[in-house]
Amino acid sequence: MPELTHFDAAGQAHMVDVGGKQETRRIAIARGSIRMLPETFALIRDGNAKKGDVIGIARIAAIQGSKRTADLIPLCHPLALTRVKVDFELDDTLPGVHCTVQVETLGRTGVEMEALTAVQVGLLTVYDMCKAVDRGMTITDVRVLEKHGGKSGDWVAG
């Protein structure tokens, strides 16, 4: 079983030293969903939410979230991201919204945390903008779908 890299031999938390690693192209794709009442879904779909363009604002929030990951997750390295692509898919069968984020960098450590943070912040923004009409919304199934680059190579969720 692989070791936990954020702890030293004495069990103390530390930021991993990535100084000796090769810079490679790193890509991570994460996805999550938010379930809601059909009426809430209709407000988003039809562009009638009182706070404005829910998906447009959530997209900007997701991008901002990816860029602020190191400020939120204590042992994450601050990274110079080269690309953040955010897609929202309206799904009337949930009913709800799926958020998929692809994050890229040229660096020494992966961008999985940035992709996960972006998804969460995007979905939290949907919740924030619609909570006045639906406090029962549920954020669910947030996970990494793919990771590419680095020493460990490619990984795709099964």
Curated annotation (Swiss-Prot):
Chain residues that bind substrate: L75, C76, H77, M113, E114
Pathway assignment: Cofactor biosynthesis; molybdopterin biosynthesis
Signal peptide range in chain numbering: none
Gene3D superfamilies the UniProt entry points to: Molybdopterin cofactor biosynthesis C (MoaC) domain (3.30.70.640)
Catalytic site positions: D128
Quaternary organization: Homohexamer; trimer of dimers.
UniProt name for this protein: Cyclic pyranopterin monophosphate synthase
EC number in record: 4.6.1.17
Biological function: Catalyzes the conversion of (8S)-3',8-cyclo-7,8-dihydroguanosine 5'-triphosphate to cyclic pyranopterin monophosphate (cPMP).
CDD domains reported for this sequence: MoaC_PE
Keywords: Lyase, Molybdenum cofactor biosynthesis
